[in-house]
Design a protein with these regions (language model features):
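Active-site hotspot residues in diverse enzymes, especially metal/ion-binding acidic/histidine motifs
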Residues: 1-148
Length: 148
């Protein structure tokens, strides 16, 4: 998806904002201090990702990528129409799929393997390359069979 929309820098970092806007999406920050992350789709090419006030920019990037996963996998792919809402925080197959989508989108395999070699498996340094949390980088590395 990221390659199709030409969102990657030379290092492999995804320009999530570019993808979001090209798809007709937008982000709103909740006025509630501890509101949960969610996606509201009004129709194809018209959706809103809701993020709380108190999360880090790296968490927000993963949330946006996660909600894009719902948009592609659970709205566009099954050819849904009309309004639909997806909430984050549940433990089910759709949430797992959205997390995997986000991980692949933010840390594409080839670029991730290059960064892993360049940084000797240092998850903190690899996380910096992709602007994700060290734990997200470590999980991606484990899935790819890479070690620190």
């Amino acid at each position: 998806m990221g390659k199709h929309h030409n969102i990657y820098s030379m290092s492999g970092r995804a320009d999530i904002d570019k993808l979001l806007h090209s798809l007709g999406g937008r982000v709103t920050v909740s006025h509630e201090l501890f509101d949960r992350e969610a996606l509201t789709v009004y129709g194809p090419g018209n959706f809103e990702i809701h993020i709380p006030q108190v999360t880090s920019s790296r968490r927000d990037r993963f949330t946006i990528a996660h909600e894009l996963g719902h948009y592609f996998l659970h709205y566009l792919h099954p050819e849904e129409t009309g309004m639909r809402t997806f909430g984050r925080g549940q433990r089910n197959w759709a949430e797992t799929q959205a997390n995997v989508f986000a991980s692949h989108l933010l840390m594409p395999e080839d670029a991730f393997r290059r960064a892993h070699r360049a940084h000797g498996g240092d998850w903190w340094a690899i996380a910096e390359v992709f602007n994700v949390s060290p734990s997200a980088a470590e999980v991606r590395g484990q899935v790819l069979g890479l070690r620190s």
